[in-house]
């Protein structure tokens, strides 16, 4: 089976498990990008612990859910943004978050995968990957 977008597959599996009030979900195939996005979601308090399980093929990720996610998804196409655009909360960003201080936009920056708040603090731009609130 060929999965075109592993990040979109993982986030949709998390969302589906979350709306069905599951306590954990197993996501496969695993990728470095998916693991880095999960680290940001864990830092922001949306998910609990997660662990990588090496099954000899693609790998799996077992994620503990906390029931705090209302909506999660990828941003397609992946827009490049400057840090000023993230700080000002432009109109197009309102399509993904209900308000500036509610939720998180996940950004791939030269400093790694960060939340939009961390990217503004480090004054760096990047490519928008996903949103969660």
From Swiss-Prot:
Coiled coil: none annotated. GO terms for biological process: translation. SUPFAM superfamilies: Ribosomal protein S8. It holds the Pfam family Ribosomal_S8. GO terms for cellular component: ribonucleoprotein complex; ribosome. It comes from the Archaea. Keywords: Ribonucleoprotein, Ribosomal protein, RNA-binding, rRNA-binding. Part of the 30S ribosomal subunit. Belongs to the universal ribosomal protein uS8 family. One of the primary rRNA binding proteins, it binds directly to 16S rRNA central domain where it helps coordinate assembly of the platform of the 30S subunit. PANTHER family: 40S RIBOSOMAL PROTEIN S15A (PTHR11758). This is Small ribosomal subunit protein uS8.
């Amino acid at each position: 089976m060929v999965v075109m977008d592993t990040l979109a597959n993982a986030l949709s599996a998390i969302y589906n498990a979350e709306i069905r009030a599951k306590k954990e979900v197993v996501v496969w195939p695993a990728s470095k990008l998916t693991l880095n996005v999960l680290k940001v979601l864990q830092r922001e308090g949306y998910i609990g612990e997660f662990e990588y399980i090496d099954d000899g093929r693609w790998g799996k990720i077992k994620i503990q859910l906390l029931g705090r996610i209302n909506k999660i998804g990828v941003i397609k196409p992946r827009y490049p943004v400057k840090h000023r655009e993230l700080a000002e909360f432009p109109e197009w960003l309102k399509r993904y978050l209900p308000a500036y201080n509610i939720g998180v936009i996940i950004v791939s920056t030269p400093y790694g995968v960060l939340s939009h708040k961390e990217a503004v603090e480090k004054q760096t731009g990047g490519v928008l990957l996903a949103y969660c609130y």
